[in-house]
From Swiss-Prot:
Annotated catalysed reactions: (2E)-4-hydroxy-3-methylbut-2-enyl diphosphate + oxidized [flavodoxin] + H2O + 2 H(+) = 2-C-methyl-D-erythritol 2,4-cyclic diphosphate + reduced [flavodoxin]
Native species: Clavibacter sepedonicus
Sorted UniProt keywords: 4Fe-4S, Iron, Iron-sulfur, Isoprene biosynthesis, Metal-binding, Oxidoreductase
Gene3D superfamilies found in the cross-reference section: Dihydropteroate synthase-like, Sulfite Reductase Hemoprotein, domain 1
Family: Belongs to the IspG family.
GO biological process, one term: terpenoid biosynthetic process
SUPFAM superfamilies with a match to the protein in the record: Dihydropteroate synthetase-like (SSF51717), Nitrite and sulphite reductase 4Fe-4S domain-like (SSF56014)
EC identifiers of the protein: 1.17.7.3
Name of protein: 4-hydroxy-3-methylbut-2-en-1-yl diphosphate synthase (flavodoxin)
Any GO MF annotation of the entry: iron ion binding
Length: 381
């Protein structure tokens, strides 16, 4: 039987075309328009601890983060932004609450963007004209960051709580103020900790204008819960073409947020797939240690920078057929594994040698592919 490539197609399919938006720049990163969906995170260090903050930014950059946000709760934090902006490998967004003067300090510091919270910055509406003028002169973009937890009291009184309509009304009002001052380089977020309310809010917002949208489920929770919430909400919106940049909020190290965000985008074919482990959940038919094989293969191939799909199959029900139709595969059973290359068995090895043999063959195939290519090889274990 001829081998069939089950890897990524040359032009990955998506569920819906991207929503058409204006494009802005956050430093060197384009957001909206035809730019890829970018992944953001936020540092957890004290911003004034320059070395620790830059170290965390470097770790985020290495993980694949495109844009990083830093907290600016005090004047001392605002005063070090110029150092961070100069030394960071990726654009910095200054996160501003309460004090409008920090916005101007951040713009002068050369950050990529400033996040403003219209719900809690003092007399924010009166400051929009000056902020727009300063940001436009510096080439700094703005994120209008509406959050259910800090919605303006007048909107809470009007709607009774942070409804999708309340979040959108706040965002659209502030957007109109910036546009009145001929400032259009902004994106918008309307975050809520309930994925259902969040999805409804973004759908409403997407109908109101062509602004780039930053997706986020605020206060999503610990790693497991937060991953589920974010994947659910982002999956719905991105599959509808809504969303231009994302941040997965987790009570976990920031690098984990980036890993989850990238995986969500890859799962929707909005980012090129790299290493992907497809493993069976194991059952009473399994004749090898599926869990161990999956973990060892993941570790052994983590350096690979071309699309590799690795499926860990633990029994003879699906293993041989799947392996024969893959570029590279292993059909496991009875303490050994048959190694397939392009549908042909090239060797049978003991179970103890399956992982090493697979990694060697995978590296050989990967070396034949240019970095960043889309397509085979697919690997099945």
């Amino acid at each position: 039987m001829p081998a069939v490539n089950l890897g990524m197609p040359k032009v990955p399919e998506v569920l819906a075309p991207r929503r058409k938006t204006r494009q802005i720049s956050v430093g060197k990163v384009k957001v909206g328009g035809n730019a890829q969906v970018s992944v953001q995170s936020m540092t957890t260090t004290q911003t004034t601890n320059i070395n620790a903050t830059l170290q965390q930014i470097a770790e985020l950059t290495a993980t694949g983060c495109d844009i990083v946000r830093v907290a600016v709760p005090h004047q001392d934090d605002a005063d070090v932004l110029h150092i961070l902006a100069k030394k960071s490998q990726i654009p910095i967004i200054a996160d501003i609450h309460f004090q409008p003067r920090y916005v101007f300090t951040a713009i002068d510091a050369g950050v990529g963007a400033v996040r403003v919270n219209p719900g809690n910055i003092r007399k924010f509406d009166d400051q929009v004209g000056a902020i727009a003028k300063a940001a436009k002169a510096a080439g700094t973009s703005i994120r209008i960051g509406v959050n259910a937890g800090s919605l303006h009291p007048s909107l809470l009184q009007k709607y009774g709580k942070a409804t999708p309509e309340a979040l959108v009304e706040s965002a659209v009002w502030e957007a109109s103020l910036f546009e009145e001052h001929d400032f259009h380089d902004f994106k918008i977020s309307v975050k809520h900790n309930d994925p259902v309310i969040m999805v409804k809010a973004y759908r409403l917002l997407a109908e109101r204008g062509d602004w780039p949208l930053h997706l986020g489920v605020t206060e999503a929770g610990p790693a497991f819960q937060g991953t589920i919430k974010s994947a659910t909400a982002f999956g719905i919106l991105l599959s509808e073409g809504i969303g231009d940049t994302i941040r997965v909020s987790l009570s976990a190290p920031p690098a984990e947020e980036v890993k989850v965000g990238l995986q969500i985008l890859q799962s929707l074919n909005l980012r090129e797939r790299k290493l992907e482990i497809v493993s069976c959940p194991s059952c009473g038919r399994a004749q090898v240690d599926v869990y161990s094989l999956a973990e060892q293969v993941t570790e052994g191939l983590k350096h690979v920078n071309v699309p590799l799909r690795v499926a860990v199959m633990g029994c003879v029900v699906n293993g041989p057929g799947e392996a024969r139709e893959a570029e590279l595969g292993v059909a496991s059973g009875n303490g050994r594994g048959q190694i397939f290359v392009k549908g042909e068995v090239i060797k049978t090895v003991p179970e103890s040698e399956i992982v090493q043999t697979l990694i060697e063959e995978a590296n050989r195939l990967a070396a034949e592919m240019p970095a960043g290519s889309i397509g085979s090889p697919e690997i099945l274990v």
